[in-house]
Amino acid sequence: MELALVGNPSNGVAKPSCNSVGSLPVVSSNAVIHPPVTSAAGATLGRHLARRLVQIGATDVFAVPGDFNLTLLDYLIAEPGLKLIGCCNELNAGYAADGYARARGVGACAVTFTVGGLSVLNAIAGAYSENLPVICIVGGPNSNDYGTNRILHHTIGLPDFSQELRCFQTITCYQAVINNLDDAHEQIDTAIATALRESKPVYISVGCNLAGLSHPTFSREPVPLFISPRLSNKANLEYAVEAAADFLNKAVKPVMVGGPKIRVAKAKKAFAGIAESSGYPIAVMPSAKGLVPEHHPRFIGTYWGAVSTTFCAEIVESADAYLFAGPIFNDYSSVGYSLLLKREKAVIVQPDRVVVGNGPAFGCILMTEFLDALAKRLDRNTTAYDNYRRIFIPDREPPNGQPDEPLRVNILFKHIKEMLSGDTAVIAETGDSWFNCQKLRLPEGCGYEFQMQYGSIGWSVGATLGYAQAAKDKRVISCIGDGSFQMTAQDVSTMLRCGQKSIIFLINNGGYTIEVEIHDGPYNVIKNWDYTGLIDAIHNSDGNCWTKKVRTEEELIEAIATATGAKKDCLCFIEIIVHKDDTSKELLEWGSRVSAANSRPPNPQ
């Protein structure tokens, strides 16, 4: 159901983001968060914003200083429980907030006006596409300069300061431009509440002369941050459960597939519950890996059309009914729109909507409540899983390399698989790491993240920084190609400053391999770097870092043993040198199909 948003329509714009609206990522749906008591003298705008970030769990803010946000940064630093992390550039600060939100449920970044805001824009767009609540804070112009026809620095030379705001309007679910104190409290609280409720980024611009000022609205006690709960329409819920149960109970060999919107719906537990009670085999869409329990006894792998896990596509596409929870069917996840699925066989469950076959459709239904209720109505049916067991033949492990034989990528990932546990998390960069990491069977508690919808190469460096900062109980294992790394390498420096102990596998194959398989050309070849030498230079004997260049399996085994043993408390950077044409068979198949989809001729006019 839609909830009323309170705000100043001239400064804040509230709008529904899409159908992927679920329950809250950090706080419970009826949470009232009480701030600590403060005196009126200390109740400034900057402190109010900082305090709110701490209350929602964003206890680290990734920032790049600029003259418009310096005073605000002082207040963020001064807030107990809040840590300001300086990044090398705004893009990586945004990527770090993205990674942080994946682990913590919400992230935050702070940049300066326009030159910083437009630089972080790409990362915020990625967070929007992945349904991640990121609070993007911008230090804005002095409030006295609005409407004066003055031309300011850090702008495009026009007296109108709205260019940055207009850019953010399409990639955030709420925008607050705070250029007066009277409604600043309301605007900040509305923006943060909207980010949590919609699970999308928001934009908050704070005038550079306002952060240190007090206002009576900041000193009222208590000042709760109230998040209005989302509730299912009970009648619709009952009808939807009845229709879906009747549809699925008539099927002979139904299956279940988890999609990426399970995250925004906070439905991981509900999905696991219905999987347990129904007896159906469970698969996962590639963009939802890590959201579905792969240790479950009836887990059959990744459903990704022609590049699915062995025998998974055969079971899913031959089913006479499939329950998809939170799917996104884009050109990447559908392998160029080549999935062999039929809508009339599907029950599609989105975070707030259910569609049974070709109809009917039921709105205002929370995924969690629907799956919990449906689990009680389904007849147990293991037929599809029994079929899977009859045809399943385990994949063979790649043979061990010969002494001094050049290392192969499949050998690398065989050894990465052995590193995984509930105390690790995998970050997979856009590229061949997508396909190789999909084959990793995740143990219980092992995290997994990648950016499939937006697919911005270089994302994983900042995301590794943010995820590791948020999930300090896990050791992050990051797999990134050389081309992607050249986009965002600088913030390995920030990892060292933060004392992180991630393991980064830099796969050096001399170019943009994923682009080669879609459409080759000389533009896909890059200048080779001495990557370990670069990290050693960034390290500069300041921090805890270990690097290694690996060319053979024997060297890889030794490097992993060191990274997980003597150097377990270090940031470990392992450069893997492989042949430029050493790619997974899945990338070859996927690339050819996506290329075909991209090169379709125009429709006749």
Swiss-Prot record:
One of its GO terms (cellular component) is cytosol. It catalyses: a 2-oxocarboxylate + H(+) = an aldehyde + CO2. Binds 1 metal ion per subunit. Binds 1 thiamine pyrophosphate per subunit. Keywords: Decarboxylase, Lyase, Magnesium, Metal-binding, Thiamine pyrophosphate. Its cofactor is a metal cation; thiamine diphosphate. Residues 432-514 are annotated as: Thiamine pyrophosphate binding. Mg(2+) binds at D482, N509, G511. GO terms for biological process: aromatic amino acid family catabolic process to alcohol via Ehrlich pathway. Belongs to the TPP enzyme family. PANTHER family: PYRUVATE DECARBOXYLASE, PYRUVATE DECARBOXYLASE 1. This is Pyruvate decarboxylase 1. It comes from Oryza sativa subsp. indica.
